[in-house]
Amino acid sequence: MKTPQLPPLIIKKSPSAFYVYTYKNKWDPEKKRSYRASFKKVGTVTSGEKEGRIRWDDHFLAERPELRDFICERKGKDYVFTPMNEGGFTLSQAMEVKQLHAGATWALDQLVVQSPIGEALKTAFPQRRDYLKVLSIAYFIILNQDNNISKYPTFAEATRLPWGAPLHPSSIGRIFRKIKKQQIEKYFSALQEGLIEQKREVGDDDKLTLALDSTSISSYANKLPNVERGRNKDEDNLPQINLLMLVESKSGLPIFYRTYDGNVPDVQTVRRVIADNSRLGIQNVVLVSDRGYSGTKNINDCLRNKVGFLFNMKCGISGSLTQELIDEERLNLQDLNRRDWYTQVFQVTKKINWIYEPSPVKNQKSTKKTQESEELYWHIYFDRQIAENARQGLFERIDRVREKIANGKALDENEQTLLEEVFEKHEQDDAVSYSIDNKKVDQKLRYKGYRVLVSDEISDAGKAWCAYQERWIVEDTFKTLKSRLGCSRNRVSDNESLTGKTFVQFLATSIAMIVRTRLRKYSEECKKNTALPMVYDGDCRVLDSLNNVMQTKFCGGYYFGEIAGKRRKLFEALGVPVPDAEPEKEQDYDDEKETEF
């Protein structure tokens, strides 16, 4: 078979790929030399580098149909042709067989499809199947338990991924920089719509209960705009950015996040989150937060924006409405008829007519004409065991202070503070002595064991208690992000990359939380139904085990081998089908010109 003849060709690099161009030589009479002109794109080097297989454009194949019978590769400066067989492969390609780690990514694929994540990604990143690239990087973070992107090429070489073509660290950096705020917000809206739709399909019309909390992500990059020194929750002596998340309590699925400067206190961030949710059209939700986010301003903002809430109020603020309500109900909270058998705490609910300004105007005084009111439910709880533990703990601390004073030993900072709070100092001649002020001790213990939850939505004290207790899920989400996935450092040097990488890490955390939730629910079912085979491994070990389910790659496709025993049970525990041995056709990963999302 005669080797095709090619016109003069040149390779040009774009941000995403190397392209093949034809050109014509023209003569420059002034410089008295020829130069290249009339460039025309005719193909793409599919490897992403200067050397590799060339995919010819359709118009060039129409001009030179003989090229259809050959595979053309660029090696050095030469173009090497290899004849193809009837299946469109060379003999060497037909003989090539490769083993890929595939079970874990197969399971993750099924979980993404079953959840609202898959459709939300397609909505946010529709161009050029970019959602597959984003998803592949997220899988890398989940299975590698590391966000160091330089390790991705080695991982991808041996792993079945949604995007099977090579992605070099520089390409991944460009993907991060292309992820903009608009696409992230589109993802949030689509994700929430999908989650509500799934709840409706199973007859659940309740509002989404979203646990709210924040964490700090440390950074060595001092030049990033949002990196500031603040109260680091990991006690790292490093600048940080703060990351706030909303996590749906029942499914464990994170549906929103926002980053903010590392020196911004928690209580100031909720107002912006409430405004973001209102602007994005995220409705039918109840925010559940801890004491760090409660306050009059945040209650008013929720009411103005029609966002439901369940806030844990601070009990230690002297003269506050919270303390006033506790004092009013103190006797009722000793009545055994007020003790709930399920939560095992005493509980009382009070309805308060809350007055607020729906449309505040700066420097304008609020009046009765401009004010509105809303009925709020203040749920007051008392736990005797917590109160007794606090009492015993305080007595032990007081005893240590008295012992050190008697032995002439120095007090540490906390002990010195306690000395000033509950002891009376007596000076007589040159002698100094201390006595315990019982009134101060009683005042310090007065509000221990009490909790006050306020809501505009949840009128039942028991349901409010359970909804608050379920906010542990957001703590578990942060542990997944920072410990299990190794994302306690961002490892980026510019703000554009930080935006994109934070989103991909959030996506990886979301998928990992689905895995954890599925395994936890399966474990609960096993306790109820002894016929189900118990799975004792944690989520990381389950994915590691499934990652050893191999897939054979051959020319033009893939197939799974036989899967038996424990690994079949692991697929069952995750609620996904076991992959069968039917061949899976290889996708076409040839890239077109790079575009913005």
Write out the residue ranges for each language-model feature.
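Dynamic "connector" segments at or just before major functional cores
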Residues: M1-A211, T215-A221, L244-F256, N263, ...
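Short, glycine/acidic-rich hinge or "gate" loops at secondary-structure transitions
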Residues: L519-P533
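Short amphipathic alpha-helical "interface-anchor" segments enriched in bulky aromatics
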Residues: A464-R491
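An anionic, glycine-rich sequence signature occurring as long contiguous blocks
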Residues: P239, T259, G308-A467, D537-F597
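Acidic, metal-coordinating catalytic cores used for nucleic-acid/nucleotide bond scission
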Residues: V288-K297, C315-S318, E496-T499
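Active-site beta-loop-alpha junctions of metal-dependent nucleic acid enzymes
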Residues: R258-L280
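Secondary-structure transition/capping motifs at alpha-helix termini
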Residues: P29, T159-A165, Q182-Q183, V202-G203, ...
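Basic, amphipathic alpha-helical segments enriched in Lys/Arg and hydrophobic/aromatic residues
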Residues: D494-V515
